[in-house]
């Protein structure tokens, strides 16, 4: 039945009820669209991972997502390299220090 006919037949409280029902329907549609948008993006990414060859990775993500990912990846790589390079440097310094100590200990034992 068309909405105009319903509104003409309805009176006071029934009209309020129809308006409330319309508000609820609009809100539920908006919520469904929001959920659908989120699910569609996630599902399409997952489906495309399995259906496309790995060489087409650029299709799976937006340019912004790839840019953000590459920035994070390069930042992480840089920090890891810094950590390991400083660790190796410290390790080399320790080895040199222990060699000097050992040689001085051997020299002192030989003298005594």
Swiss-Prot record:
Residues 103-112 have a biased composition (Basic and acidic residues). This is Uncharacterized protein C02B8.1. It comes from the Eukaryota. Residues 91-112 are annotated as: Disordered.
